[in-house]
Amino acid sequence: MLEPSNLKTTSGSEHRGAMSIQLLLFVDERPSSHEHIEQIQHYLNSLKPDYPYELQIIEIHEQPHLVEHFRLVAAPALVKVFPEPRQTLAGSNIVNQLKKWWPRWQLDLEESQTENTNNRQTEQTKAESLNSVGYSAELMKLSDEIFRLKKEKDELLQQLKFKDQVLAMLAHDLRSPLTAASIAVETLELTQKQEDTERRAQLREQLYHQARKQFRVMNRLITDILQASKTMTAQLSVYYHDLFLPVLCQDILDEYREIFKEKSLTLVKDIPQDIPTVYADEELIRQVIVNLLDNAIKYTPSGGKVTVSILHRTTQKVQVSICDTGPGIPEEKQERIFEGHFRLKRDQEKEGYGLGLSLCRKIIRTHYGQIWVDSVPDQGSCFHFTLPVCR
């Protein structure tokens, strides 16, 4: 039912027990609305006592469901809900329209009274009409709630389905590096019982290297899954503060020094020290840079080049760019790579599930920045993102 605070009712005082013409007046918050209410009430009160009516005043912002139910497109609007058929008058000249239609409505009311000769039936008809507006509002609210719950259910089912797929992929993909690492460790165990020679020392070093590499692969697979799970089930907690990007980038690059060396990659840095601070969450931005750097290293062939640069693009934004000399990304796929579950054909043999870029976009958008890629097939890719300058 409608809340009493949302409806203001006036009526012909001498006909409270009789059937009456029932009207709904929809008004907005404009100052002129009060004037329209007074004009309509003045006209209705000026009618002869033989013309009973009940007028409910409804504020649009408090009852949007009723506005939708009656399909109103303008305010003020006067809706006759009884006797049937329903009729709507709208615009600034409602009083003139009332003068035209009131005699017809009175005839309709008299016909309804004639048809309902039984007193109980008359009162029931009136009560049903009085409550119809409230029921309509409740039905509209329930309909909206059902739609919202259905949408939420579909989204949850989609998430569960995707997580099942990812778990199956994880179990399959972990098998290979786990087996390789296990063989390396078992071989190391066997070499412990043999005499040390230069050849066995080299073999042990190779086995250690192989085991470390496979453990890194497994760690990356699991990290990817955990990031995706966190992204889909919770909102990001962002702790903004002043952040000096050159220091953050250098710290990350120092951690990757050995990886660049192992793959014989050239690192080119263009990181000016006069870059202004940005307003951002350090851990989340670190996650973005690490993800983009991981991708650049993964797709750049041995002997290739990775470039990291920072640019004070405008007075309001700083831009970070991470470029590689890998296979590039087809133009028609450059937007889709930021979707949650999308993977390029080239990635089928790579570890990971293509979830990192989706998380990166969410983080950057949370910081009111932008993230995009410039790429030409066979010529590499450049990923860029912007962050707001601290003021």
From Swiss-Prot:
Class of the enzyme per the UniProt entry, highest EC level: transferase
GO terms of molecular function: ATP binding; phosphorelay sensor kinase activity
Gene Ontology BP, a term: circadian rhythm
Record field: catalytic activity: ATP + protein L-histidine = ADP + protein N-phospho-L-histidine
Residues bearing the modification Phosphohistidine: H172
Entry's EC annotation: 2.7.13.3
Pfam families (alphabetical): HATPase_c, HisKA, KaiB
Gene3D superfamilies on file: 1.10.287.130, Glutaredoxin, Histidine kinase-like ATPase, C-terminal domain
KW Kinase (keyword) present: yes
Alphabetized UniProt keyword annotations: ATP-binding, Biological rhythms, Kinase, Nucleotide-binding, Phosphoprotein, Transferase, Two-component regulatory system
Disulfide bonds: none
PROSITE patterns: HIS_KIN
Domain Histidine kinase intervals: 169-391
Quaternary structure annotation from Swiss-Prot or TrEMBL: Homooligomerizes. Interacts with KaiC. Participates in the KaiABC clock complex, whose core is composed of a KaiC homohexamer, 6 KaiB and up to 6 KaiA dimers. SasA and KaiB(fs) compete to bind to KaiC.
PANTHER family in UniProt: SENSOR HISTIDINE KINASE RCSC, TWO-COMPONENT HISTIDINE KINASE
Role, per record: Member of the two-component regulatory system SasA/RpaA involved in genome-wide circadian gene expression. One of several clock output pathways. Participates in the Kai clock protein complex, the main circadian regulator in cyanobacteria, via its interaction with KaiC. KaiC enhances the autophosphorylation activity of SasA, which then transfers its phosphate group to RpaA to activate it. In addition to its output function, recruits fold-shifted KaiB (KaiB(fs)) to KaiC to cooperatively form the KaiB(6):KaiC(6) complex (independent of SasA kinase activity).
Protein name: Adaptive-response sensory kinase SasA
Organism the protein comes from: Rippkaea orientalis (strain PCC 8801 / RF-1)
Protein encoded by which gene: sasA
